[in-house]
UniProtKB/Swiss-Prot annotation:
GO biological process terms on file: endoplasmic reticulum unfolded protein response
Predominant localisation class: membrane
Pfam families on file: RAMP4
Topological type in the membrane: Single-pass membrane protein
Compartments it resides in: Membrane; Endoplasmic reticulum membrane
Transmembrane segments: 38-58
PANTHER family: STRESS ASSOCIATED ENDOPLASMIC RETICULUM PROTEIN SERP1/RAMP4, STRESS-ASSOCIATED ENDOPLASMIC RETICULUM PROTEIN 2
The species this protein was found in: Bos taurus
Descriptive protein name: Stress-associated endoplasmic reticulum protein 2
Gene Ontology annotations for the cellular component aspect, listed alphabetically: endoplasmic reticulum; endoplasmic reticulum membrane
Record has Cell inner membrane as a keyword: no
Described purpose of this protein according to its UniProt entry: Interacts with target proteins during their translocation into the lumen of the endoplasmic reticulum. Protects unfolded target proteins against degradation during ER stress. May facilitate glycosylation of target proteins after termination of ER stress. May modulate the use of N-glycosylation sites on target proteins.
Known partners and oligomeric status: Interacts with SEC61B, SEC61A1 and the SEC61 complex. Interacts with CANX.
Sorted UniProt keywords: Endoplasmic reticulum, Membrane, Transmembrane, Transmembrane helix, Unfolded protein response
Length: 65
């Protein structure tokens, strides 16, 4: 009886190994989140938007006076 149970457990372990073969994680380290836009591109965008807003304010002050 013990031998049958041992064989059954070995068969289950073997079949589990076969069904999970190839499902190995690429890395064990947690994946860090990547931004879709780089920091330099974001800084350029903020510079252009803020610069044009400041330029527009200065131009409207000159025209108003």
């Amino acid at each position: 009886m013990v031998a049958k149970q041992r064989i059954r457990m070995a068969n289950e372990k073997h079949s589990k190994n076969i069904t999970q073969r190839g499902n190995v994680a690429k890395t064990l380290r947690p994946q860090e989140e990547k931004y879709p836009v780089g920091p330099w591109l974001l800084a350029l965008f903020v510079f252009v938007v803020c610069g044009s807003a400041i330029f527009q304010i200065i131009q409207s002050i000159r025209m108003g006076m």
